[in-house]
């Protein structure tokens, strides 16, 4: 299962579709965002994905976590959203 990485420039609907697809296929999705703009896009995508999945009769929960990520030899703090069926 791949991590869905979100940037501030990510299309919300594309990320929402990826989340919904991962839930349907793997019953779990992990979304990672670094920075306020990226976290904003990730949360909006999560809200859209809930609607997509609800129409399929799938109810999900989202568990936010802080994670440290190494980028170009620097450690950055990211938000990871773990999405699972309820």
Tell what function each PLM region has.
Residues 36-62:
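Short, hydrophobic/π-rich interface segment
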Residues 1-2, 86:
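Low-complexity, interaction-prone regions
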Residues 54-86:
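C-terminal edge-of-domain segments
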Residues 10, 34-37:
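Short beta->alpha linker loops
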Residues 2-28, 42, 46, 50, ...:
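Conserved mixed alpha/beta catalytic, RNA-binding, or beta-rich assembly cores of soluble enzyme
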């Amino acid at each position: 299962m791949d991590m869905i990485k979100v940037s501030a420039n990510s299309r919300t609907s594309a990320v929402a579709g990826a989340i919904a697809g991962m839930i349907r296929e793997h019953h779990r999705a992990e979304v990672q965002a670094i920075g306020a703009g990226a976290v904003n896009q990730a949360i909006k995508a999560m809200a859209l994905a809930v609607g997509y999945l609800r129409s399929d009769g799938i109810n999900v929960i989202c568990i936010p976590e802080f994670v440290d990520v190494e980028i170009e030899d620097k450690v950055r703090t990211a938000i990871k959203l773990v999405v699972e069926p309820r």
